[in-house]
Amino acid sequence: MRATEFLIERWTKKTLDNYFDHKQDLDFKNSDVQVSEPFDGCILLKYKTVPDVARSFFRVTEYYDGKHYGGSDRSVSLVDFLDNWMDRAGNVDYFKFWDGFNIPDHAFRAWKRSAGGLTSAEQVMVDAVNRASKGLKKYCVIGVGGTDSATLRHEMFHARYYLDSTFKSQADALIQAHKNDPAFKAITQTLIKKLDYVNHVDEEAAAYLYTGSQMKLVFGTQAKHLVKLFQELDQK
């Protein structure tokens, strides 16, 4: 494609308006995030949009759980992140796709030590967590963007799994009892091969089953019998 054709295709009224609007308000403010504690130790940060929560959490999440960084002490640089996530067309769909995040306290503290300079979005997130975690011996940070109730339920599973030993034991018992179920295997394989999970795969599968949303679309299986079992954790 010649340069002039590229500009004609890319420079439309909509793309220009979006680009110019984006330049008007780049800085995050404390008012851009709502902070609450749904239950003891669970620090919930709610953002208006998916890009807002993803901008705030992408480095700490990749440090804790990412394919290229999870399980290591390496800091997550923006250059490496873009190299790993940008496709050949220049798209980084991470910031429009991932709408929920969960970070246990030990990972959050370790990431802060390695992170170096913070973006404005990260600084607002860190300040919010520092205030909310004051006096807490153990906590889990969850961040959600938008208003999807399934995303919130999914992240709440992770927080309960980390903070509530009884809940974790019951969830682990279900995982062990059904790890060889074809539906459970299908979920874990999709997580590993298509969604780039390396660590905490069984926990992640359990969180999706506990949520029970869009199972067929994402994993190719309804897994209704497993969804029922994991959702019954609320009744125990």
PLM region spans:
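Residues that cap or delimit alpha-helices
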Residues: T49, S165-T166, K179-N180
